């Protein structure tokens, strides 16, 4: 999930969906809380059954939406970046990432985790391209919902959604956000700046934004 600090500074960068396992009797809040906890911990040794389940789900998504291909992770490089052993890198970065081929496509990314799937699409598209992007998202979600029993949570609508029934509402929110982000009058940036001021107080700026690394 996009963290709060990032959202405050930059605004949301993508429209996100989370496909979660909702057991009988669990509320949506319970499921979301468990999802956040799962993201914050090292889940321990790899479970072969879980790894096989993820591979099968990723394959089902590829079959439903053939434009997606798995990203091949270089665990040696990941271990170097994380300053850890390769075995630990494999354990911590155990998700399967699917991207559109050839890139960039619509920029949709699918991440298959142990007990959930995340689907994101950047705020790039309007009109026919936006419609097509959400059609692809529906294709991605179908096997996860029908074959694996996952429920779809839409943080933008703040509720569980059903596809394709909720696609028009989702696309309307998406295109409104695209319009706000690309507003030539800068209202989105002004609103983001005001939100930062409310959260942190006014912070004196000593460098231009592009000099942040100095």
Identify the function of each model-found stretch.
Residues 7-214:
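Acidic (Asp/Glu-rich) sequence patches and key acidic residues
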């Amino acid at each position: 999930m996009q963290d709060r600090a990032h959202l405050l500074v930059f605004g949301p960068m993508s429209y996100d969906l989370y496909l979660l396992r909702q057991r009988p009797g669990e509320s949506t809040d319970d499921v979301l809380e468990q999802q956040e906890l799962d993201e914050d911990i090292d889940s321990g040794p790899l479970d072969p059954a879980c790894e096989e389940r993820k591979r099968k789900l990723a394959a089902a998504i590829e079959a439903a939406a053939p434009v997606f291909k798995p990203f091949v992770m270089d665990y040696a490089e990941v271990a170097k970046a994380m300053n850890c052993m390769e075995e630990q890198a494999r354990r911590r970065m155990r998700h399967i990432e699917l991207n559109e081929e050839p890139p960039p496509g619509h920029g949709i990314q699918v991440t298959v985790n142990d007990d959930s799937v995340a689907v994101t699409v950047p705020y790039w598209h309007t009109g026919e391209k936006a419609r097509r992007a959400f059609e692809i998202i529906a294709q991605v979600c179908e096997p996860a919902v029908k074959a694996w029993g996952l429920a779809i949570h839409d943080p933008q609508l703040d509720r569980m959604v059903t596809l394709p029934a909720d696609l028009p509402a989702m696309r309307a929110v998406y295109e409104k956000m695209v319009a706000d982000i690309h507003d030539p009058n800068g209202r989105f940036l002004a609103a983001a700046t005001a939100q930062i001021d409310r959260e942190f107080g006014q912070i004196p700026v000593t460098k231009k934004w592009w000099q942040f690394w100095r």
